[in-house]
Amino acid sequence: MRACPDRSSALALLKKYNAEPFHIQHALTVEGVMRWYAAELGHADEADFWATVGLLHDVDFEKWPEEHCKKAPELLAEIGCSDEFIHAVCSHGYGLCSDVEPTAEMEKVLFAADELTGLIGAAARMRPSKSCQDMELSSLKKKFKDKKFAAGCSRDVIREGAERLGWTLDELLEKTILAMRSCEDSVNEAMAAL
């Protein structure tokens, strides 16, 4: 079992450096998505590690957007995160704001899913249900192809993430929809409690 900070310490660190509800919601979503992927890919015993990396992956973004993935090691050290944990967090910005390459399976999942959760979340907000529970792959693929929709979500990074995992783009899209369905209610409950 990999060492990681307990959830309450991780959440406190996230909230110390992030006040915007959007950033908190994104962190909680990526946490849930990473937990789902850990179980799905046969790493249930590492689910807490995967999820906590997801929770803290953007810990430095709100206050230091120009130093994203560069300020994170200092902040993560505040709660005693291991070098392995810090490497995983920093690897999600590979090629954009970090030279730390995602090499472990968990890092590749984070790299691929981070941008994609933003796209799926934006697509869900456009649906009558405001939810990804009834989202179909075909609907997401249309949004993916529309470069003007959720333009801040890099399609190139999402494609590269699928390639790094050895998956088709459709596999990544479909799995991440399922992952977001699994945590949508708990994320909404947590946001309502803020």
Predicted regions and their residues:
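Charged/polar positions within long, soluble alpha-helices
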Residues: 39, 121-124, 185, 189-192
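Divalent metal-dependent catalytic cores for phosphoryl transfer on phosphate-bearing substrates
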Residues: 43-149, 159
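A structured, mid-to-C-terminal "fold-capping" secondary-structure block
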Residues: 133-135, 139-194
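Acidic/His-rich, divalent-metal-binding segments that scaffold phosphate/diphosphate chemistry
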Residues: 1-64
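Short polybasic/polar patches that bind polyanions
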Residues: 15, 35, 39, 77, ...
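Predominant activation on well-ordered alpha-helical scaffold segments within soluble catalytic domains
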Residues: 11, 28-35, 70-73, 120-123, ...
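Conserved active-site and cofactor/substrate-binding residues in soluble primary-metabolism enzymes
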Residues: 5, 9, 25-29, 67, ...
